[in-house]
Amino acid sequence: MTPSISWGLLLLAGLCCMVPSFLAEDVQETDTSQKDQSPASHEIATNLGDFAISLYRELVHQSNTSNIFFSPVSIATAFAMLSLGSKGDTHTQILEGLQFNLTQTSEADIHKSFQHLLQTLNRPDSELQLSTGNGLFVNNDLKLVEKFLEEAKNHYQAEVFSVNFAESEEAKKVINDFVEKGTQGKIVEAVKELDQDTVFALANYILFKGKWKKPFDPENTEEAEFHVDKSTTVKVPMMMLSGMLDVHHCSILSSWVLLMDYAGNASAVFLLPEDGKMQHLEQTLNKELISKILLNRRRRLVQIHIPRLSISGDYNLKTLMSPLGITRIFNNGADLSGITEENAPLKLSKAVHKAVLTIDETGTEAAAATVFEAVPMSMPPILRFDHPFLFIIFEEHTQSPIFVGKVVDPTHK
């Protein structure tokens, strides 16, 4: 007979993304032939693209008037790792909710894809800091299934910590210290409280630090207006950059598209909709269009103005993932029997995702560097990001969307 007690599991998907616009030496154009074309990379990029858009649309549905910022990679990695210990409908819901077609892709290939992605993200890069971490926090009297532990370590590079959840303050400190250290102090107090029945916690973080290949000069940053909506205007520090940039207008999306590279293996796509076309952009954008944007670069002389900003996201993944079909794991019908050898059933009592993004200029020494670029001697057209826009940050090798955001009001952190 199944015991009446139900143990709780905490899932924490945390992210820190710092994008300082330091001045850097100019570098050569990205060679698209060097992108990782392995089947594992293609598989994970395709599914993460679908998952990112589904998740974004659900966030818009829940709140269309606030900034959005999250990491599809962080959330998907945490749930995929959890699927290692799930069975039955719980297992199927997780993987299908992550947009995997289980009739076409084997479970082994799914986890190999995540393993390859995490290895790629954690690859040393002298110009770009991009690292991930997964922590398993286990009550000191709870015995985990050895197969789950081995696969979590092998595929997801998970670290295992023994904690006493009966001492909730100490348990919180262990988890928060792991996330704070991994995000270099940018995410603190990721866990504010623990349910009294929690016996197992899973935490994932991603840290990103990048420098623009074509940098902004802080001397050119000026206060300017940003139109939040038709009746609301705020003052923001607006960065400016002139030169040969990847900018074009996409008639399908009714939006201007700006593609900016980081020094290292990452790039950002900014999507600025025409007046009144934000909803059209959000409904039309898909992974096929994003792929075309990344492949079809169109350099032109242009002057761009974009806000210096810091935004964050703090989401309850239970309300966010349920509309995507991931429901069983959160209720008493959850089957996570592949995680623990204990008889008492385990369910996901809480799942949170925290994200932080900063785009800014830093330091006077950086401003002293010089970038040389030949440009035509004419006044460039001007593109102002002075009303709500979207952005996606990609890892170049796999073309996986690691961060997705919407800036509605740059003054709201």
From Swiss-Prot:
Cellular compartments per GO CC: extracellular region; extracellular space
Gene Ontology MF, one: serine-type endopeptidase inhibitor activity
Spans through the membrane: none
Sites where a glycan is attached: 64, 101, 265
Keywords noted in UniProt: Acute phase, Glycoprotein, Protease inhibitor, Secreted, Serine protease inhibitor, Signal
Pfam families registered for this protein in UniProt: Serpin (PF00079)
CDD domains, per database record: serpinA1_A1AT
GO biological process, one term: acute-phase response
InterPro entries on file: Serpin_CS, Serpin_dom, Serpin_fam, Serpin_sf, Serpin_sf_1, Serpin_sf_2
Cell compartment(s), UniProt: Secreted
Segments of this protein annotated with the region RCL: 368-387
UniProt keyword Secreted present: yes
Predominant location category: secreted
UniProt signal peptide: 1-24
Family: Belongs to the serpin family.
Additional information: Murine alpha-1-antitrypsin is represented by a cluster of up to 6 individual Serpina1-related genes. The precise complement of Serpina1-related genes present varies according to the strain of the animal.
Comment text on domains: The reactive center loop (RCL) extends out from the body of the protein and directs binding to the target protease. The protease cleaves the serpin at the reactive site within the RCL, establishing a covalent linkage between the carboxyl group of the serpin reactive site and the serine hydroxyl of the protease. The resulting inactive serpin-protease complex is highly stable. Variability within the reactive center loop (RCL) sequences of Serpina1-related genes may determine target protease specificity.
Function: Inhibitor of serine proteases. Its primary target is elastase, but it also has a moderate affinity for plasmin and thrombin.
PANTHER family cross-referenced by the UniProt entry: ALPHA-1-ANTITRYPSIN, SERINE PROTEASE INHIBITOR, SERPIN
Protein name per its UniProtKB record: Alpha-1-antitrypsin 1-2
Species, as recorded: Mus musculus (Mouse)
Lineage, broadest ranks: Eukaryota, Metazoa, Chordata, Craniata, Vertebrata
